[in-house]
């Protein structure tokens, strides 16, 4: 009998470095990371503290080590839900989704036996959502 895989289907990941989307788009409310000490960062919404995260939130190699410790063979990666930004302008959310999806796709391509990726889409605009969903499929999510 074949050995069964242990798959963690509910995990979240962020890019280690998130651009200043507020400056890029011209309005506030977007998350960025404040790396205030090694292996630890504050998720900030503008200047307001949102949540503390550890390196396993952005470092796939740390995740692989933790998965090995817990006998998890594969993780399904998705962005942290606050990053969806459904309140933002649809075109900006598309741009943000593409950034996040490219990040996850890069991890999946580098470690295809360890990670599966789920994409984010701009749900406030069905046509843009379909456009990004189709792109997610093309990039391996």
Residue ranges and their predicted role:
Residues 1-141:
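Helix-coil boundary/capping segments in enzymes
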